[in-house]
């Protein structure tokens, strides 16, 4: 057998072997390349915007902690969590006055301060001086994030623009961002839109601020109602499970509706988005 023929036989054997391995799935370079080049989930989404209170921030324990810090040294002994719950319960009615048009827009810091006055007599703190009340109002600026937020946000920020689409005002959002090292690219939502969710302008002005169409923006929240409102306007939607966010028996472990991405927590949510 001459050398040329031997060379052809060896090459043919090598190709047959490679083909057999490829068929077995043990060696498939073209398949590996195709998998590596697979499109990421939600390729048209450029920005993630977030509900904050409850989704990103543990408002209940944070408010209770800060109120206790201020008042306990003054001799008060309240049910701190009940105080936080009562204060938060005034949140919706206060915003509804503005959403309904009965009142011009004011930012959330002002509503929180007014709502504090509404519950003072219930907890027998009517005699507190204004500087103490102002300090209590800053409890909302000193909230901590849930434990899954930091690591997951670091992953998400590698791919997406990120901002709050929150009812919180800019100063409040800036303070909690600095406290928790949140990687916001902007602070959007209520104050720039001069309204409160679920008013359509809050979602749409947030998209416009990034020069993006609604379908290029994903609203991320632990509250299905918030997501449904955004979805109706064309935003993509992501649900993050947050059972117990407002105490035992509260919060959503699962969404109440059909949304684009559903995560058990922010780690799972980042996984689903391929980051």
Model features per residue range: what roles?
Residues 2, 10-16, 37-45, 154, ...:
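Asp-based, Mg2+/Mn2+-dependent phosphohydrolase catalytic module
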Residues 1-7, 30:
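N-terminal secretory signal peptides
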Residues 38-89:
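Active-site neighborhood of HAD-like aspartate-dependent phosphohydrolases
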Residues 32-36:
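Boundary at the C-terminal end of the N-terminal hydrophobic targeting segment
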Residues 74-75, 81-134:
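A metal-dependent, Asp-based hydrolase signature
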Residues 56, 165, 219-220:
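Conserved SAM-binding loop
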Residues 9-29:
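N-terminal export signals
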Residues 131-179, 187-190:
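Substrate-recognition element of Asp-dependent hydrolases with the DxDx(T/V) motif
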């Amino acid at each position: 057998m001459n050398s040329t023929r031997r060379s052809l036989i060896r090459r043919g054997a090598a190709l047959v072997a490679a083909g057999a391995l490829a068929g077995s799935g043990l060696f498939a370079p073209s398949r590996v390349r195709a998998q590596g080049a697979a499109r990421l989930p939600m390729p048209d989404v450029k920005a993630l915007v977030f509900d904050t209170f409850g989704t990103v921030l543990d408002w209940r324990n944070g408010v209770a902690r800060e109120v206790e810090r201020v008042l306990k040294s003054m001799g008060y002994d309240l049910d701190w969590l009940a105080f936080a719950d009562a204060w938060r319960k005034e949140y919706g009615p206060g915003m509804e006055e503005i959403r309904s048009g009965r009142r011009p827009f004011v930012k959330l810091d002002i509503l929180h301060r007014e709502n504090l006055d509404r519950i003072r007599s219930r907890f027998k703190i009517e005699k507190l001086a204004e500087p103490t009340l102002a300090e209590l109002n800053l409890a909302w600026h000193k909230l901590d994030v849930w434990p899954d937020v930091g690591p997951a946000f670091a992953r998400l920020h590698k791919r997406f623009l990120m901002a709050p689409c929150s009812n919180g005002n800019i100063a409040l959002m800036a303070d909690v961002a600095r406290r928790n090292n949140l990687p916001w690219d902007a602070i959007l939502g209520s104050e720039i839109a001069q309204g409160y969710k679920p008013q359509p302008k809050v979602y749409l002005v947030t998209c416009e601020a990034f020069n993006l169409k609604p379908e290029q923006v994903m609203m991320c929240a632990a509250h299905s109602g918030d997501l449904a409102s955004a979805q109706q306007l064309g935003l993509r939607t992501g649900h993050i499970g947050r059972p117990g966010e407002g105490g035992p028996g509260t919060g959503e472990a699962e969404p109440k509706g059909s949304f684009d991405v559903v995560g058990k927590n922010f780690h799972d949510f980042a996984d689903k988005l391929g980051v």
